[in-house]
Swiss-Prot record:
Pfam families found in the cross-reference section: Ald_Xan_dh_C, CO_deh_flav_C, FAD_binding_5, Fer2, Fer2_2, MoCoBD_1, MoCoBD_2
Gene: AOX1
Its biological purpose: Oxidase with broad substrate specificity, oxidizing aromatic azaheterocycles, such as N1-methylnicotinamide, N-methylphthalazinium and phthalazine, as well as aldehydes, such as benzaldehyde, retinal, pyridoxal, and vanillin. Plays a key role in the metabolism of xenobiotics and drugs containing aromatic azaheterocyclic substituents. Is probably involved in the regulation of reactive oxygen species homeostasis. May be a prominent source of superoxide generation via the one-electron reduction of molecular oxygen.
Assembly and interaction partners: Homodimer.
Organism the protein comes from: Bos taurus
Protein name: Aldehyde oxidase 1
Amino acid sequence: MEGGSELLFYVNGRKVTEKNVDPETMLLPYLRKKLRLTGTKYGCGGGGCGACTVMISRYNPITKKIRHYPANACLTPICSLYGAAVTTVEGIGSTKTRIHPVQERIAKCHGTQCGFCTPGMVMSLYTLLRNHPEPTLTQLNDALGGNLCRCTGYRPIINACKTFCKTSGCCQSKENGVCCLDQGMNGLPEFEEGNETSLKLFSEEEFLPLDPTQELIFPPELMTMAEKKTQKTRIFGSDRMTWISPVTLKELLEAKVKYPQAPVVMGNTSVGPDMKFKGIFHPVIISPDRIEELSVVNYTDNGLTLGAAVSLAEVKDILANVTRKLPEEKTQMYHALLKHLETLAGPQIRNMASLGGHIVSRHPDSDLNPLLAVGNCTLNLLSKEGRRQIPLNEQFLRKCPSADLKPEEILISVNIPYSRKWEFVSAFRQAQRQQNALAIVNSGMRVCFGKGDGIIRELSIAYGGVGPTTILANNSCQKLIGRPWNEEMLDAACRLILDEVSLPGSAPGGRVEFKRTLIVSFLFKFYLEVSQILKGMDLVHYPSLASKYESALEDLHSRHYWSTLKYQNADLKQLSQDPIGHPIMHLSGIKHATGEAIYCDDMPVVDRELFLTFVTSSRAHAKIVSIDVSAALSLPGVVDILTGEHLPGINTTFGFLTDADQLLSTDEVSCVGQLVCAVIADSEVQARRAAQQVKIVYQDLEPVILTIEEAIQNKSFFEPERKLEYGNVDEAFKMVDQILEGEIHMGGQEHFYMETQSMLVVPKGEDREIDVYVSAQFPKYIQDITASVLKVSANKVMCHVKRVGGAFGGKVTKTGVLAAITAFAANKHGRPVRCILERGEDILITGGRHPYLGKYKAGFMNDGRILALDMEHYNNAGAFLDESLFVIEMGLLKLENAYKFPNLRCRGWACRTNLPSNTALRGFGFPQAGLITEACITEVAAKCGLPPEKVRMINMYKEIDQTPYKQEINTKNLTQCWKECMATSSYTLRKAAVEKFNSENYWKKKGLAMVPLKYPIGLGSVAAGQAAALVHIYLDGSVLVTHGGIEMGQGVHTKMIQVVSRELRMPLSSIHLRGTSTETIPNTNPSGGSVVADLNGLAVKDACQTLLKRLKPIISKNPKGTWKDWAQAAFNESISLSATGYFRGYESNINWETGEGHPFEYFVYGAACSEVEIDCLTGAHKNIRTDIVMDVGYSINPALDVGQIEGAFIQGMGLYTIEELNYSPQGVLYTRGPNQYKIPAICDIPMELHISFLPPSENSNTLYSSKGLGESGIFLGCSVFFAIHDAIRAARQERGLPGPLRLNSPLTPEKIRMACEDKFTKMIPRDEPGSYVPWSVPI
């Protein structure tokens, strides 16, 4: 076999050649480290987030066409790119050349916050426009289906995309985002006239036109190469792996004979993740992506034959074309396949993955294999011995040797037969999220009847996700043949299939009862579908479907989205150049979109740089018997391995580690994921390989405490207990009409910031100085803990933060620990050290939002007034205290939300468990505490027979009132938000419409709920609220401003420049902000608590006013001068042009002994109304509409403020509905990445989203009367939770099920389905508790 070793491809129009290619190298690190194209980001490494999206272009010499498709660079081996052209975000535009319209519009439509996901979003949209310059809304939504954003809530990204939509015959690109295709989705009036957007967030007239003629051309050299008929097999190799890329079938077969165990790889979407995450290594890879015979598309008399190398995206296009051309009776299978292909993975994976690879991988949760198996599909195989054909049946799917591919065989193509008349095929799936999520259970079902007789002649049913392989219910189907298609058959079928497709209680993946229920629920849906079709074909002989059942056949998937925004106009009295109150674009928006914004890991490699990674504990509670690092140290490139013995203890006054005074554990571990060793090597690859070779011997210890209930049982708490009491609770209980007791459990939440924990530590070489470049929220803490570990004073450690790719509270405490260890390694070896956590490590190590258990006892009157409330709050703190006590305290101080409970008592405990310590996360205890209170109110309403909204209103604060901690409060704006939300959401009208819908539909239900919000702003002490700033004026009249706040996406730097512009009456273009550093602003407080702009803005304002006061004589002498004139004059008179600004903090205190104080400066008020629709058979839900009204004071920047509100709302919606952490009974976290842990995607947002601000209100103590909005909106996500609750209540009420209805959070599809009890949930078998070990435990 001839071989060549040179790899040739193009990147952004430039030729790239590599003579010694390592087949293990993926495109992402090659772009970032070798080509220094850092715009393409690492987000997860598994193709699940889209941050690394690039466009790949290939020329097909047969069709003479160029195919452009999006791909995940993290899964693309560079060896697979021979002859391809890669386009990255840098290749389509930059600030140095010209920006592309896609980049411009995403930035100017305010579609970026932290900006880390933005290059991937840009490239997904760009690729779509290369193929479809005037896309439809459906195409846009599909194109972004593989991209995640944790900040924006997607609305502004969608609005940016809509500006490219077709406009002929449609108003899709109107400025308010409202399209004629989308209006009136629920048949109800929208906003009244006069409620339009008060000013535009962006002006489409400014946008650059999209001109396809200006795009990069496909390199002619690659076209010439592809046309050559004398191509050779190419072999690329390294010490560990060989990559073989044959050109002909003959060469492919030769390679397969020589290396029969080598996998055949097309897109690397299956083999790649297995190698990365499961440690499966293949010394030889065969990649036949240039063989024409594997890409055939043949139409025969019997069906369609598709080549094994055809991508899933191409299969989707082919099937869509076929279904348009052929009669429906022939395309039943193709329609079913298309249904799954709409939601299978994201566009990037669908364009990379091949049909053959998907089939042969035989993943147990494959969406296509169950369908192909029931459709009598066959596989065409080839080997040296010749061709043969095998059925794609259960034996093949189970890898039975007699029905499987032989090691030397390859799959050439797949035959998918046409369907026949009286034959019907359907596809079903239910996942945690509608799109880009593996199915919990999926199914393919096919039935064939005798002509017009309704008697089953053939029946085939297959399920995925319910066993180690796809399972066919062949025995059940055989017993049903010959039976008429009626309800008796259905009942028998359910019982037969439940018996045959059995799941043990300990089945991997858990959710056993839910999966059993889906097995029969899907079967019932199939029965309904076929029954309706039969009725349509023969009105006489088949009974009509009950009208209440018809909606069960409709999909819940959201396809189009629209929104309206109503916010404040800038003050008419202010100067026209004054930017305060205007929707100024994010300072880094364009750089986010071009990939030029520099994050920590984008910094160039420093000379002699090392890489550090961690070895973590695999046990929840154990003694460390021994640590053997010898094998790891012997590997090439390994420099050192640190253990706890090398690092000195740190001063425990840092508080966050409590009694663990070691950064690396030496004697005992208290959770899975605890840091044990740090491996330092010359490269990341070498460090990670070495980490896998460290051997740790453990001796397990008891008890292992994972849950709150176990902590309560073992009295495992951190001290002290906190208590808040108001009024006389015990006496009040004697005076009420009714008393109820209940509890609610709320699961935790992963931060899922897009940029993982990142740091680069550089020793300066003298005086033991060291620079720490880090993605962090609390530079001072990093400075202090690093100085403590290095035993130097703080003035030798400088911490620098340019920007952070998302944080949400997760880059405060744990970042300090990671940075201190990295700094110790850098100091020890006198070399720079970089540490970038992989996504799985990050989630495992850093903890997240605290799971909560809330217990309540409420005493109330029959009219809904709650007179007494006694509550207990428990949070799962994890192994170390971290910020858990503060979270409990904030939860207690905020628990009453918008309500006045005249007699209230609440106690709170932080539970010590054997989990990684949980920490701050947006909302800081309020999302949990508030949900407990709202659950109590909902149950009180049910007991009183009243609507929950009425009970909420009855118990709401009156205008002038007092909180439980005796702080005076004026809630006028709370009442106004509630009333306006009621009005703008048409609540009364829609409530009636929801009730009408529910009365007419049995298997689908709608729910409507409205919740108020009172979110206190303040940090509990004056010291925690101090801030400083430094402003320099240069002689050319330009200004440099620095302050202590961290830019995490919330736009604080943008607001600070607006402040300087107003105070100095200077254009924004003259002001610059470089970043945050302990070198310029010492002793900073952490950025969080919604006060970053408040506090630092007041410090910046103070600095500017100091300068103005100092320069007043100069300016008065030359009032018409410029800043350049004034600066030069001041310099000539030896007047300082630099000033520090300082804000000492809001007056804030709380005395826990008395339960009294003034912990908060002000309150943010709001209300949200959400409507949902649920599928009672599957547990799926659709977010139909949300209306939010917020009191924002006076908005400094409406674009940034509305972005914070809607981003927080979507994150909260995820918290309360789909984001679920799964732990093993041994304390191992399963959900360590986007493939297991689902945050909201574009498919999850409300189809309609309406946000409005109250008119401006005055507050002389805050920055221009503004309010901090970073956290408050997250709680409003629970309006979706209670809307689902309302829908479930309606379903249960119709079924005659008794109350009370108590639902835990998150309200996942599993919880929704199992709460909608019916005949199917009753027929499933249930395992006795204690008779099995569950796959996961609820934490």
